Every structure is written in C-alpha cells, then in structure tokens.
Design a protein with these regions (language model features):
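Structural microenvironment flanking redox-active thiols in thiol-disulfide oxidoreductases
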Residues: 7-11, 40-47
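A short beta-strand-loop structural module common to alpha/beta enzyme folds
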Residues: 31-41
Length: 88
C-alpha cells in the first residue's frame, strides 16, 4: 500500500495549514493510502535525519515497495494536492 508521511514540528503554523490541506485533498480523491504523521526536531529526531528532512512541513509519498515517489517541502493548496494525489 502507498504511504503518505507528513513531517512537522510543534508550533508550526505552516504545518497546521498543510495538514488541513492534505486532509481536505485526501477526502476529495479516491486513493488507497496509509497516512503517518511524524512530529520532531530537524537535525535531532532520528526519523527526520533518516529521511533527510531539512524543512517542515515536508510530505513524502512512497509507493507499494516503499520507494519515495513524491516529496513536497512547504505548504501547497488543496487544489494542487488533489491534482498530485489523484495521479498516484
């Protein structure tokens, strides 16, 4: 199954906006995807380091084999996310 991993940190307004936009976009498209949320500190949290997270929010989509197929850094509109997610 495809996976969407969302990386954020505490007190991040852009992260809150992107999380909401992802939620709205996923509700608008028909895609079977596992969603994981990761909260931490850039450069200190192991999962952030292991996945080369340099900025938040960062959203990574992996295919059925666990290979990264999409990386979004920053905040994107619901419309853009619908377009991207509908092509998965």
């Amino acid at each position: 199954m495809k996976s969407l991993i969302f990386y954020s940190k505490a007190n991040c307004p852009a992260c809150a906006i992107m999380a909401s936009n992802i939620d709205h976009a996923l509700n608008a498209v028909n895609v079977d995807i596992n969603i994981r949320l990761r909260h931490g500190v850039i450069g200190k949290t192991k999962t952030f380091i292991d996945n080369n997270i340099k900025q938040v929010p960062t959203t990574i989509v992996k295919d059925d084999d666990g290979k990264e197929v999409l990386r979004l850094v920053g905040t994107y509109t619901v419309e853009y996310l619908i377009g991207v997610l509908s092509r998965l």
